[in-house]
Amino acid sequence: MADSTGLQFTVKVGALPESTFVVAEFALDEALNRPFNLRLELASAQPDIDFGAVLDQPCELLVWYNGELQRRVCGVVSDFAQGDSGFRRTRYQLMVQPALWRLSLRQNCRIFQAQKPDEILSILLQEHGITDYAFALKNEHAKREYCVQYRETDLDFVNRLAAEEGMFYFHEFEAGKHRIVFADDAAALTAGPELFFNLGNRSLEQGPYVRQFHYREAVRPSDVELKDYSCKTPAYGLSHKKQGSELEHQRDTYQHFDYPGRYKQDPSGKAFAQHRLDALRNDAVAGQVKSNCAALLPGQTFSLTEHPNGSLNTDWQIVRIRHTGEQPQALEEEGGSGPTVYHNEFGVVKASTTWRARIGSPEAPHKPMVDGPQIAMVVGPDGEEIYCDEHGRVKLQFPWDRYGSSNDQSSCWVRVSQGWAGGQYGMMAIPRIGHEVIVSFLEGDPDQPIVTGRTYHATNRPPYELPANKTRTVLRTETHQGEGFNELRFEDQAGQEEIYIHGQKDLNVLIENDAAWHIKHDQHTDIDNERVTRVRKVPGEEGAPPSLGNDHLTVEGEKRDHIKADYSLTVDTSMHQKLGQSWLTQAGQEVHVKAGAKVVLEAGSEITVKVGGCFIKVDGGGVTLVGPTIKMNSGGNAGSGSGWAGKVPKSMEGMLDSPHTRWMKFYHLDSELMPLAGTPYKAVLSDGSVREGTLDGEGMALLEDVPAGTASVTYDLQDTFADLPRESISALTGHLDSLSDEG
């Protein structure tokens, strides 16, 4: 029952009758971006109330004035204690908090991907059975590609995420329930009562009033600049600035600069810079107020009137408030006979100001830092062995991620550190699915992992047994979707030093200039099939024809060749042989020497032709013919040989895969055989591609990187030969000088 002041406080707990408890006093703390905290001092005629009927049960405090409800607060009992017992009453103490408080009881590690902030917040609320919430968002909030809750309570994560996105939240109350409202602009605030400023000569019957208003201004950062970096746009600054307002009473040179800004896109950068500025200046213009209006709560505005300082008679919003009430008559045994009283004290800012929580404050804890590197497994979709994107990034499964499925959805694309990384040069070794990697975090940020190392474990063993092969340095790969491997191995054991190379299929080597081998002992080459070697033409300097390639061989000792089948040697011009002593040739059946013009045999002392018992000998003493019969012009036929049946060597075509192995050079002359410099040409290559240009000063053109096959070249003669007679023009011909598939 209300006393003479008209005030009364009542409480209802769980399913207990409303008469179970009477309120002796209460203290209620509320603030933006914080769960409220209600402490109740109660008395009851029951000395043995069942704790199970109270703890974690709904509780509602009602504040009445002259029988009219002024304020209600609904929540759940988080703490219940029994105090002193007397003859009639037993004292109890309750702590009541909103359902959101339950999020502080669960700490977790998890990953959210490609979700908007409000979607992430909804997931967390619903997992705790909270369905009465709303989003009053004015601004667009981009999806977060990768957002990690790392060793945080769900409540800390909600508060931090909301603050990073410039959101704030407050509670609204209805009969038996309360709603959480998330907002990002002051326009979402609820308009509250009009309160007059009471100089002390007016009573409560004239309406709720403000009895104290302390106004304050403070110097705060004047502007904010944030900067970040994205590997997708490395040359772009990603810098954003925001300038504060209401700087008339302070300097405008107090800039707050920070890196990284925790964003990768311009829209987010602009918003985050504004959020940071609003948070840093959230108390630059503020007030501390005392009143008797129980209806006030965070997320609400009120209008102040009748203050002697007319500039303060405007709209204000409440950012935090403490309500206190005492009902002494509830404590009969302690002689409680004073009046029921209520008052509050609260902090305010301008109603037009969008209040945002400052990171690092009780309303918005700092983002947790990862203390050091972590272990993770490379993952990907079923059936894949290597899974990466165009940047060589991979997907990871962290041991602490209980929600991941060890597939391509387990994480965002994570960058991989390589030993060397330049513009289309450097090293590249993609971690494969199932590999264990070491993951570091840029600035300790769990949202920015990067693979910095790889490790073996009990399942993924090293290429060779250890420590038996501890002197080996090995680079071994594994055939993708097949069996086999490539390997480069260094053996450093004294006396057994070795460089070993194993290729599962082909070896292609391209040296743009010279290659030199110095082997100080033996060289053994074992080829199971065929060997094809070519010493080819070398492109000349600009405008010069190519030079011929030569093969030089010097053997200080013997050279022994054993060819078990045929041996074919083709020399397009001349073959010169010079022997220091003897030339000894033995054929099992036939030696056939044939010349297109002449054969000359010249000896310093003797030439002998011998067949069976017959011979012809030419020496310094004359010509000797010996045989059973000497025939001169006696008929018969000359003997014949088998003729040349050698084979040309195989071409290197297709054996070397190089982007610079084929070129084509051509030139064009007039009827006087003078070069036609500057003549436009059009070359249609064998693959249908077209090259166009003009001939150089020598009437020549060189095309590189051309496909093998036949090409056609036509010339635009219209302007070039305008001063020549028709007869000369018709006599002109185009010459395809050389089409070479050699580079």
UniProtKB/Swiss-Prot annotation:
Protein name: Type VI secretion system spike protein VgrG1
Main localization category: secreted
A Pfam cross-reference name: Phage_GPD
Highest taxon above the source species: Bacteria
Organism per entry: Aeromonas hydrophila subsp. hydrophila (strain ATCC 7966 / DSM 30187 / BCRC 13018 / CCUG 14551 / JCM 1027 / KCTC 2358 / NCIMB 9240 / NCTC 8049)
GO MF annotation list: NAD+-protein-arginine ADP-ribosyltransferase activity; nucleotidyltransferase activity
Designated gene of the protein: vgrG1
Reactions catalysed, as given in the entry: L-arginyl-[protein] + NAD(+) = N(omega)-(ADP-D-ribosyl)-L-arginyl-[protein] + nicotinamide + H(+)
Protein family membership: Belongs to the VgrG protein family.
Top-level EC class as recorded in UniProt: transferase
Keywords linked to the UniProt accession: Glycosyltransferase, Nucleotidyltransferase, Secreted, Transferase
InterPro entries hit by this protein: Gp5/Vgr_OB (IPR006531), Gp5_Vgr_C (IPR054030), T6SS_RhsGE_Vgr_subset (IPR017847), T6SS_Vgr_RhsGE (IPR006533), T6SS_VgrG/RHS (IPR050708), Vgr_OB-fold_dom_sf (IPR037026)
GO cellular component: extracellular region
Subcellular location: Secreted
Function text: Part of the type VI secretion system specialized secretion system, which delivers several virulence factors in both prokaryotic and eukaryotic cells during infection. Acts directly as an secreted effector with an actin ADP-ribosyltransferase activity that disrupts the host actin cytoskeleton, leading to a decrease in host cell viability and an increase in apoptosis.
Xref: Gene3D superfamilies: 2.30.110.50, 4.10.220.110, Baseplate protein-like domains, Gp5 N-terminal domain
EC annotation from Swiss-Prot or TrEMBL: 2.4.2.31
